[in-house]
Amino acid sequence: MSELLATYILADPGCDAEKRAEQIAIGLTVGSWTDLPLLKQEQLKKHKGRVVNVEETESELGEKQATVTIAYPEANFTNDIPAVLTTVFGKLSLDGKIKLADLEFSRSFKQSLPGPKFGVYGIRKKIGEFERPLLMSIFKGVIGRDMEDLKEQLRQQALGGVDLIKDDEILFETGSAPFEKRITEGKKVLEEAFEETGRKTLYAVNLTGRTMELKAKARKAAELGADVLLLNVFAYGLDVLQSFAEDDDIPLPIMAHPAVSGALTSSPHYGFSHSLLLGKLNRYAGADFSLFPSPYGSVALPKRDALAIYDECTKEDVFKPTFAVPSAGIHPGMVPLLMKDFGIDHIINAGGGIHGHPNGAAGGGRAFRAVIDAVLEAEPVEEKAKRSPDLKLALEKWGRVEVSV
């Protein structure tokens, strides 16, 4: 019988963590057990949850807690993420200090999920870069700007050598810069930049609107030649992401933005672990990219949480790996540390670290590319800066984060 394993962290589980775990296992499956007649117990046995493990520990704050793993028969729910979450964490999420830390799916259940269409290798193949972290930049200050302003931003970022450019997640459908026009006009700008530089740049356009409208809009984006779709996954739901990944008429990579996820992950006592929501479930539902706060920037996660997301995005599984995108407050002086912690297969994502460069967005992009090259070539960053005026200016403005051995 196939089972799904759910691991929880119970803060202050009471005097008997084993008893609390058993209450959860029974309460979220057959409802009661000891009061049932033997015949009914036999009939319901295959639907009964079971406690796999209970480990009592202390939190980092010295609080008593228990890590509990419960097995749920997959016969109890349909093979979709909403059914799973409702089963293992529906009413339970309302029942005191309890956090869903992980889900372990059976191989048969995984076969019903799409995973990324392109994954790390597919994205690299589109860009033609395989031996370094990719570089992404973000539109900045876009509210109230017209199409000409956005086109110039796009052009300057592309000339700086970035591999991907994404819309701001708060750029919605506007009269001055409508969705379809951003795709068609942006495509022209990037083609012109390619002719000038010989470097391929992909543009992630923000897919927004009412849920019922999104599929038609995504299909139209594909027809118009869009490169990538940016989706605020947790404003819409993982099932919406999955529906795009499964649709053959939407043959585009999907970039999952973490907007709203903080309300679901940030508490130590409630909600989901960062790695489950932004790592595993994003990947399983079909995200080719997963953005999340880096451990170093302006909206930082603890390093263990950021690395756990990266691990869920990239570790061996039946699905293609998702490109991990640690973000927020990234500048060129952080790149050696980013590459030490996240290796080659991640995307360096910068906003102000590119647009705030003294030589503009193009200079910001060149500074990032220079420091990436320095790390790959094992050249001291200060030596590289002597031959890269843009990197020198960036280090003077933002400084450098030291890498401990």
From Swiss-Prot:
Coiled coil: none annotated. Pfam families: RuBisCO_large, RuBisCO_large_N. Keywords: Amino-acid biosynthesis, Isomerase, Magnesium, Metal-binding, Methionine biosynthesis. CDD domains: RLP_DK-MTP-1-P-enolase. Pathway: Amino-acid biosynthesis; L-methionine biosynthesis via salvage pathway; L-methionine from S-methyl-5-thio-alpha-D-ribose 1-phosphate: step 3/6. One of its GO terms (molecular function) is magnesium ion binding. The active site is at residue 91. Binds 1 Mg(2+) ion per subunit. Substrate binds at residues 140, 166-169, 257, 329, 351-352. Its EC number is 5.3.2.5. Mg(2+) binds at residues 166, 168-169. Its cofactor is Mg(2+). It is an enzyme of class 5 (isomerase). It catalyses: 5-methylsulfanyl-2,3-dioxopentyl phosphate = 2-hydroxy-5-methylsulfanyl-3-oxopent-1-enyl phosphate. The modification N6-carboxylysine is found at residue 166. InterPro entries: Diketo-Methiopentyl-P_enolase, RuBisCO, RuBisCO_lsu_C, RuBisCO_lsu_C_sf, RuBisCO_lsu_fd_N, RuBisCO_lsu_N_sf. The keyword Thylakoid does not apply. One of its GO terms (biological process) is carbon fixation. Has no RuBP-carboxylation activity. Catalyzes the enolization of 2,3-diketo-5-methylthiopentyl-1-phosphate (DK-MTP-1-P) into 2-hydroxy-3-keto-5-methylthiopentenyl-1-phosphate (HK-MTPenyl-1-P). Belongs to the RuBisCO large chain family. Type IV subfamily. Homodimer. This is 2,3-diketo-5-methylthiopentyl-1-phosphate enolase. It comes from Bacillus licheniformis (strain ATCC 14580 / DSM 13 / JCM 2505 / CCUG 7422 / NBRC 12200 / NCIMB 9375 / NCTC 10341 / NRRL NRS-1264 / Gibson 46).
